[in-house]
Amino acid sequence: MHDPVKKSAHLTAGSTSTAEKLCFDKNEFMKANFSVDEFLHKNRNAPSLEQLRDNLGLYLKGLRAAMIDLINEDYADFVNLSANLVGLDQNIKTIQQPLEQFRSDIESIHGLIDENVTELRAQLEEKRQLREFKRGLQSLKKVYETINKLQDLIDRKLSGEQPIKAVDLERAALDLIQLKFHEKHCFKHLSPDHQGKIQQLEEQLHQHLRRFFNDALSQARNSAPESLERCLRIYITLNACDQAECAFREDVVAPYMTGVIGEQQLQNSPQGLAGIYSKILNFISLHMTDLLRLTLYSDKFPGFNFVVNSYWSDVETRLELHMNSIFAPGNSEVFYVKYKCTRDFLGKIEELLTCSGEQAVTFYRQHKQTKSFEARWNLPVYFQICFQEIAGKFEAQLEPVLQEDSLKDNLTDSDYKISAFNAAKEAMTRCWAEGVYLPEVFPKFYKLNVQVVLRLSRWITDAITQSKGSNFSKPYTRNQLLIALHADIRKLDAHLPELQQLIIKSVPVEQCTKIFSDVLAKSMSCLADTLGAHLTNIQKTLVELLIGECETENVRQVNDLPRLYRKTNREVPTRCSSYVEQMLRPLKAFAQQNESQLGTLVVEQILAEVASHITKAYFNVVSDVLTSVQKTEESLRRLRNVKSGGAATVSTGSSAVMSDDDKIRVQLRVDVTSWRQELCKLNFQATQIDKLVELTNMVEDSIKLKDNSA
């Protein structure tokens, strides 16, 4: 037989001659997912349906011709195939009946096997039940025997007033373990009476074991710890460590604490709460030394935790019920002392547990009674009281904004000049002071620090605003207030790094991470920026005040120079006018009085702005005066020309007498030169002052221009 792929290729090749004439792709018919609808949809744009039909007819003829050629080429194979199919049905019928019989036999065997499996499972289940019943009967027999044996042992060896021997308790404990084991396997066969009897025996054994435990504790204090060790081992054997802890709490801890913890004992204690805690801690050294040596300080007897489950449980319950006055937060100072004393007490318990490992400390911290005890201390209320005390005292210094005594005198180097800053520093320092700060409320105290600085910042803004008011009337001047503000802000800004270190020392150890340090540094930087923003505002206000003192009336006196020199026959000016000194006097006084407080750099910045502003106004006035003088001079020249009938004017350049206009120009030059020289004495270059170079050039040029025209 030929390869099917080859035949398909042969059929396709047979229609190749017509492929070039077709209006569709003949390969579409060879696809496995060929669809007539899709074929018609793709060829909907054919020239016409008639042409599509004709092309399909041509393609069909080509396929038929190719198929005939294929049959002719492989004729022998086709004939053999037909011959082989003759009698095939008869052969199939011949093998069909044996196969069906074989299937029937297999199904019957499957059914037989299933029946046997079911029967076997039933027998195994019956055997299991019998075995379980047998074991139950055996356990029941053991239970009866052990009950009698244990009862006899308790009656003979453990009851009565005679001392209990450890060996008898150990035998009884083993019998009880065996009894509990067999009880579990025959529980459904036991009568209620026997179940009650087992419970009764267990309770009796624990009572005798409890008595032996108390005797062993007494003997251990007398240097005989062997009985205590055997007793603890019996508790471990019975898996009753909690019973030992309960017995110790009720029989040893509770009687002692009854006489120690109470409101009356607290009132009668000379040392107050610290004395109560000292007595509570003394119990450990008095009654728990040997017990802790065996259970806490070694792994010899695992499973016991007498410190938490016996000692601390009883102490915490009594503190909450019989001494709840210690939790009252009404008086912040008393609350702080009690809370710190309590934290020290809890810390000593943790220190005791540290010997057993971190797991014991964690168990103590996460214990429900520890959580309950810590929750009783109302720290939010305590902080609120501290907040009212600290913030209230600070706020009292800020209202009203400016008081008669806001500016202090005779202060030390560590004090601020303004009382509001002293109050702010005191408030921030008090947040971290001993007797106020508690690590558990660190975020709240830190937030209060930030609030104090921001509130002070708001007060500074209000103080600057009031200093600009027209009704300012205080024992101190505006300048004194602003300069004190400037100095105190810089001093407080320099104090922030010291405050940052104080906060880092106060933060709880577990929170003092690199992330916290970065956040704290960023926060302090923001506070420094907030304070620093006021420095610019203060300098601007000082500039405005100085300009008001120097400029308004003094600069206008330049306009009086023409009136002073015209037709007055004054001498040629050689000294500067008085207004120059009047403009300079406030600048010199400001530099002399405030350089030590503000610093040379700040004073120079303020004076430079003031001098620049004055010089600009001075430049404008001088320019107007020179222009006016020039116009007046030209008007007089034209008038003389008219009177002389147009004849050439007589030159005055050779005259020894200086004109009034020239005297005005000379006076302006003397004044400007003096202004410039005095500014240089204040350590200013001409280029540092706006319009000073232009002003100097303008008066010099006016003189030169006059000389040239002459």
From Swiss-Prot:
Which of UniProt's keywords are assigned here?
Answer: Golgi apparatus, Membrane, Protein transport, Transport
Q: What is its main location?
A: Golgi
- Which GO terms of type biological process are on file? Golgi organization; intra-Golgi vesicle-mediated transport; protein transport
Q: So which domain of life are we looking at?
A: Eukaryota
Write down the membrane topology: Peripheral membrane protein
Q: Which Pfam families match?
A: COG2_C, COG2_N
Q: Name one GO cellular component term.
A: Golgi membrane
**Compartments where located:** Golgi apparatus membrane
InterPro entries with a match to the protein in the record: COG2 (IPR009316), COG_complex_COG2_C (IPR024603), COG_su2_N (IPR024602)
On subunit structure and binding partners, the annotation says: Component of the conserved oligomeric Golgi complex which is composed of eight different subunits and is required for normal Golgi morphology and localization.
Q: Give the family this protein belongs to, as stated in its UniProt record.
A: Belongs to the COG2 family.
Q: What task does this protein carry out?
A: Required for normal Golgi morphology and function.
Q: What is the protein's name according to its record? A: Conserved oligomeric Golgi complex subunit 2
Q: What is the lineage of its organism?
A: Eukaryota, Metazoa, Ecdysozoa, Arthropoda, Hexapoda
